[in-house]
Amino acid sequence: MLRSLADLDVNQSSVNLRGVQRERMPPTEWRRKVGYLPAESRWWSETVGEHFPRVQADILSQLGFEGEVLTWQVERLSSGERQRLALARLLSNQPQVLLLDEPTANLDPVSTQRVERLVMDYLRRKQAACLWVTHATDQIERIASRIFYLDRHGLGQKMAT
């Protein structure tokens, strides 16, 4: 579903962003405005820095990284480091909508808190929207303003506490 919303999979859905239909926007513009973070991030170059056209040191710092991380070899990154850096890469593009698929699944509690704090701050500052997919019910209670769930009956909604 997230890939379809991000216009990465062929679909017949009708989606709009601030009143503009996806079909009326060039795909590259849509994908700049609607940022997707997959459960497993993709890395195609040898060093971390090659993946960051615009480096925002404050984002890296908030996720627990020093500037030297940009010189690191991608192959040496742990799954948690890859996930946090993929989030930094996504946020550096400043999308209006975040589609996050299990963004903290590979993270320790300290890194999870950092990610939650960074994303929530980003949403407030940019007045952005977020669809955050997770199985962590305690996390849902901490971050959600609205909760949707899928079960055998389909899509449901419950109030956030």
Residues of each region from the PLM?
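Conserved ABC ATPase signature
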Residues: 73-77, 81
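Hydrophobic anchor residue at the start of the ABC signature
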Residues: 87
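Catalytic Walker B motif of ABC-type/P-loop ATPase nucleotide-binding domains
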Residues: 98-102
